[in-house]
Amino acid sequence: MSDTRIVGKLISTAARSSLQPIGLARKGRSRLWYDDRGWSLIVAEFQPGRGPGTYLNVGAMWLWADRDYWAFDEGARLYWRGDGSLRTEPPLGEAGWTQHVDFLNADQFSRDVALAAEVAARRVVELRTQFPDVAAVADHLLSRATRRAESPLWHAFHAGAAAALGGDAAAAERSFAKVL
């Protein structure tokens, strides 16, 4: 069996063990798992890299924009340590953080990707807690500036949509005015 197939099987096993028990479903036979909340998705992606292994992306996708692709509107790449602690921003200048699980052999990868899947599950729970409803999304988006590499128009659109759906017409109007 090729390294790529072994990696895929081990990711599937680890994700099934950590993500399925908390309610995530797998998209077909892909490396993508999701929690459908009706108005949003929480997405966990074991992203392939150049060689055998995986990166880990976990974030929320708002469903009020009509798209035919998966997106990370809030969150994405995760960084973690061997003790399971995690960050959503690159920890510059600090040793011991990783963002990629390299495949060296099946035993090592199985152990390391199991930790990554546990980190993904913990981040999913954090996002569920952070965004229990649309009003919480609106509060969050309205209170933060547009991030680097984020489109100001998409940020304003998402803030406006969340505010409108959360019942704050004035905030929705202010946000949508930035889009038009």
Segments (PLM) and residue ranges:
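Intrinsically disordered, low-complexity regulatory regions enriched in serine/threonine/proline
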Residues: 1-7, 33-180
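Amphipathic alpha-helical segments
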Residues: 5-26
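Acidic carboxylate-rich catalytic motifs and surrounding loops in phosphoryl-/glycosyl-chemistry enzymes
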Residues: 28-32
